[in-house]
Amino acid sequence: TTEEMIETYDVNLISFNLLYNTIKPYLVDHAHVIGISSQAALVSQANAAHYGASKAGFSAVLNALRLEQPELKVLNAQLGPIDTPFQKNADPTLKYFKNYRHMMIQPQQLAKQIVEGIILNKIEINQPSWMQIMLKFYQLCPRTLEKLCPNLFKNKV
């Protein structure tokens, strides 16, 4: 619906910009800004266009912020599905959860990686890493992969 589309952009893109503009005067040099984005920013999926677009926009904002404000440490965590209660709440049928639980990131493991990323001044965390590699390949020849493996791009209900 139109309302869901607006909410998706509001939650995933607009809210960060509003929050950042509010806290910007209080940030000190070398402050860390951590953005939780999605691997969906790198791929087109049926029934998830606005989610992917909002996350792609968010990743672009984080990358631009890193360039515009070099005194900040900006970390973009581009993630696949995470094993949280959100998965069950978003799809009461649990179809997505059951189909993809085996590849879901564990929150405790992810938190550790983000803390390590902060300590090491990383600019990106991409998890799961195999998905990131696959999506880089997708970016080289998207239409070919969409034709050869159409079900990979139609997993959202």
Question: Model-predicted segments: where are they?
Answer:
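Catalytic Tyr-X3-Lys helix of short-chain dehydrogenase/reductase
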Residues: 24, 57, 62-73
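Residue(s) in the substrate-gating loop at a strand-loop-helix junction
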Residues: 38
